[in-house]
Amino acid sequence: MSMQPPERRDIPAATVTRLPQYLRSLHTLAAGGVTSVSSDELAAASGVRSTQLRKDLSHLGSHGVRGVGYDVAHLTAELARALGVTRTWPVAIVGMGNLGRALAAYSGFAPEGFDIVAVLDHDPALVGDSVGGLSVRPMTDLPILVAEKGIGIGVLATSVAGAQSAADSLIAAGVEAILSFVPVALAVPPHVSVRRVDLATELHVLAFLRQSDSIAATTPNPTDVGRAG
């Protein structure tokens, strides 16, 4: 069940998006005292097919042990290493509106290796407020904070109008990874990674799925209609 260190770019992007869920499931299993897990069990806990899970883990060099499965502690360590969360990542949140404040107060980031070390806003009226145990800093302090605290990830929770400027400030300060909750495409250099979480888009997708289910439930089956005559 040994794993060879994977090259980051050798792992498909779709696989990378599923690895955090596997890691979260493993943490839950470990907390419950589970020391080994089959691919079927881990797949069920993660909401994927076992064939998909085995394929994803094969990109890390793991194939499990027939009849035994995966060692939970070992697989947890290897997934954490592959995802880069064997270290703690200092994170800054820009934008202290309702969403930014909620993100700053969320206690679930630290256990996953992400430490919120700075919160910022361009509005002087918000500077100095206490959010998530931190004092809101002005955007002009961003370069100093990035240098002092080693901030590597920035979270955008600004208005649409302020998103690009905030992203530019993060990049100029040396931040090369941005998680944006703003529903707008950002123009960034090739070396900067951006992930966008568009809550409205996700709601649209859910609305479409529910509407499709409703239509399917109320549309007569052509075979049944023919038989009715």
Predicted regions and their residues:
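HTH-adjacent hinge/linker in prokaryotic transcriptional regulators
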Residues: 36, 40, 44-91
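Glycine-rich Rossmann-fold phosphate-binding loop(s) that bind the pyrophosphate
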Residues: 96
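Extreme N-terminal segment that seeds HTH/winged-HTH DNA-binding domains in transcriptional regulators
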Residues: 1-35
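Phosphate-bearing ligand-interacting subdomains
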Residues: 22-30, 132-229
